[in-house]
Amino acid sequence: MVNYKDLGLVNTKEMFAKAIKGGYAIPAFNFNNMEQMQAIIKAAVETKSPVILQVSKGARQYANATLLRYMAQGAVEYAKELGCPNPQIVLHLDHGDTFETCKSCIDSGFSSVMIDGSHLPYEENIALTKKVVEYAHQFDVTVEGELGVLAGVEDEVSSDHHTYTNPEEVIDFATRTGCDSLAISIGTSHGAYKFTPEQCTIDPVTGKMVPPPLAFDVLDAVMEKLPGFPIVLHGSSSVPQEEVETINKFGGALKAAIGIPEAVSYTHLTLPTTSRV
């Protein structure tokens, strides 16, 4: 058993509490190799931002659990080397689909895990999420649950349709599972290729394809039901800036999960950006 605190990592509890108070979101980047991790940490230090390093089950299998653990520890030391004396870095399992996967990550030094039971019937999702929470909280590891299904493909996670989160279920789900944050579905999409042409409309002025609009009414209703509770939006890497501003008006998303396509280089990752979730 390796405790994440021995690696210099933190969980999301204090990080999210500060974000709620400060009115900002925490970026969560999926990474698959050393170059991506270097770029993420460099950008986080330069912008003085806490950051969540996300790893899918497939990426963990590819990297090797032991090597990945030391990469995360190395990320903390790299941030210090770059001038950040107290790095706020989370190592998070993205879309864990079984209790066994989540337990394995917790036992090997992850500070946060996601259990995605959104494909299950509601009561089964609650039971699975609660089981993970009960184990994780013994070691002060935070847990993200999910209600609703995102379309798109990301590693083993795939769906050809959206199922928006039902706002009437969020209080019951959060209360009964004890999860620390909740991923919801409002129309964002997994993967590098977000929408098919059939899902888009054509802008009559520019002639460009426009993706389907996000369901801000769902976000608004969820925020009303769970004020001050950490809310997560997955598939956020291609949300336009004007949509980000609208999300912020509704109270923002406390965690924005951002995937990095394999073709994106270190140079591109470290270019200046004006986008802020």
Where are these regions (language model features)?
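Alpha/beta enzyme core
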Residues: 34-50, 70-78, 98-119, 130, ...
